[in-house]
């Protein structure tokens, strides 16, 4: 008996991986499914590209108001293929938003939000909100003029909310004005809170799809 077969048998005995493999590879695909049903999967691919390129940029990015812009400039001009990594990150971000919008339209037009898939739709809407938050927080990280004023405007929007508005503004900014605490918060959101939140909701989304299957034609 070969070593590879022994290893496989060891895992099979404990995890029954063959049953998992059979379930994944034998899932029924309805005949009405076409290329537009791939938009959600493309959105996932864009997210994975975002994760990989974003992780690479954390080796060079410095989340301080005095060094953020210069660290991005250094990445673009001095790091080997740094310009490509950041460009792919930006392009895939735009592609992710576009694919998400098209995916939402496809699901809505084909009635994929109806019973019994309401919770699948809800998790999708939550992921759409998280994706928008990704864009807002990522836009500010270079800390150039565009990023600074974008943060100032966006973080000031909750001020219009009665009672808790001022508290939310101070929570986002880390104080009364935009500064280092604001950049730190946005960096933390963009690189830790939002990615893991999106990953959790993606897992829930996919498990529901696996359980309920793809919605039928109208």
UniProtKB/Swiss-Prot annotation:
The chain crosses the membrane at residues 35-55, 93-113, 119-139, 189-209. Heme c binds at residue 38. SUPFAM superfamilies: Transmembrane di-heme cytochromes. Pfam families: Cytochrome_B. GO terms for cellular component: plasma membrane-derived thylakoid membrane. Heme b 2 binds at residues 89, 190. It comes from the Bacteria. GO terms for biological process: photosynthesis; respiratory electron transport chain. It is a multi-pass membrane protein. Heme b 1 binds at residues 103, 205. HAMAP family: Cytb6_f_cytb6. Belongs to the cytochrome b family. PetB subfamily. This is Cytochrome b6. It comes from Prochlorococcus marinus (strain MIT 9515). The gene is petB.
């Amino acid at each position: 008996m070969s070593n590879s077969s022994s290893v496989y048998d060891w895992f099979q005995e404990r995890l029954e991986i063959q049953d998992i493999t059979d379930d994944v590879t034998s899932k029924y695909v309805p005949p009405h499914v076409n290329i537009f049903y791939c938009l959600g999967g493309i959105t996932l691919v864009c997210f994975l590209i975002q994760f990989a390129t974003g992780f690479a940029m954390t080796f060079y990015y410095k989340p301080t108001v005095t060094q953020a812009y210069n660290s991005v400039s250094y990445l673009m001009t001095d790091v080997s293929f740094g310009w490509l990594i950041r460009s792919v990150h930006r392009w895939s971000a735009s592609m992710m938003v576009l694919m998400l919008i098209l995916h939402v339209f496809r699901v809505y037009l084909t009635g994929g939000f109806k019973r019994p898939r309401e919770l699948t739709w809800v998790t999708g809407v939550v992921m759409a909100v998280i994706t928008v938050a990704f864009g807002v927080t990522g836009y500010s990280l270079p800390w150039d003029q565009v990023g600074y004023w974008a943060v100032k405007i966006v973080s000031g929007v909750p001020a219009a909310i009665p009672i808790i508005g001022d508290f939310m503004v101070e929570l986002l900014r880390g104080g009364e004005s935009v500064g280092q605490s604001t950049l730190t918060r946005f960096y933390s959101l963009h690189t830790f809170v939002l990615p893991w939140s999106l990953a959790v909701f993606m897992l829930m989304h996919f498990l529901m799809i696996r359980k309920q299957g793809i919605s039928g034609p109208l």
